[in-house]
């Protein structure tokens, strides 16, 4: 998809400003709105944010960013796994960021988003409105170069009588409120680099997404579809990610995630499932200079689900990647843009959850390519 960005700043006083930030026109209902009407999707563009943010307008929080529009609380990503530990989809709402309270800062967002609630055939759907509160108390100093964040998120639905009737009488899945709470500690190092440790616990549909073997961001839906018999089951996630410099010419990045859940709805093994998973990636590299690095990335994952009948299903695999990157700075995780040339071997050891195979029914693949990563 194509994303464009606009930003207009108007200073209204010596201490206050107003900014309009976003990505062109967006809808107010779904978080992933499309612009265009080509049924084949070729002329579609997808947009995320469109909001107005102000600073200096609130007497009780003059330093805070006060926003209104289609936006959400900042996302926190496990970069080498390409999914999030903290994510609330952009939606119509209001929020504050970087509000100084005591030793730390508060981020708070109140947003509404429509989701598609499906029936048990997964063929029919109804649109229901959800409301989310996302609250974080961050940048709490602990010791030298260490900070703490405490976070909470709660999602509830504002359902009409007809929507509830469809759930009671026409086979649509019941909406169940869902929450996620946690904490994270970030330690920065004297020579540069950092490590972030986090603990998260969630229930119902967010817990179901903890249990996904891929794309395990804390969503409330599965690819935009809400379904499943959620029974209050919970899941826990422990993560570590960061990077460290070793001497003048070496850097190592890491990402480790351990998750487990009990009595959750699994999108692979259905209701009353338990799961346990481990994902680990390490990426050492040699720093030639500020603009060049050569390294290897080693990754492994394993997951076991147990369904309501105690049947066990296993998914596991590994990959090895050799790469050379052109960069703007030496940090692996915080410097962009970068261009990477790579050769990757990936092997599926077990695939009882998804049954995936590569071309010609193979369980492995070798690929050579180039990619660019850009943030804006």
Please annotate each region the language model reported.
Residues 46-48, 64, 90-92, 129-133, ...:
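Residues that flank catalytic or metal-binding motifs in active/ligand-binding sites
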Residues 322, 362-376:
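Outer-membrane beta-barrel "beta-signal"
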Residues 135-159, 164-307, 316-322, 326, ...:
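Detector for outer-membrane/organellar transmembrane beta-barrel domains
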Residues 1-27:
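Glutamine-centered polar micro-motif within alpha-helical contexts
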Residues 35-38, 78-83, 116-124, 160-172, ...:
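Extracellular loop and loop/strand-boundary signature of outer-membrane beta-barrel proteins
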Residues 316-339, 343-353, 357-360:
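Leucine-rich solenoid repeat modules
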Residues 21-118, 130-147, 151, 343-348:
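Outer membrane beta-barrel
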Residues 28-31, 69-73, 111-115, 153-157, ...:
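Outer-membrane beta-barrel pore domains and translocons
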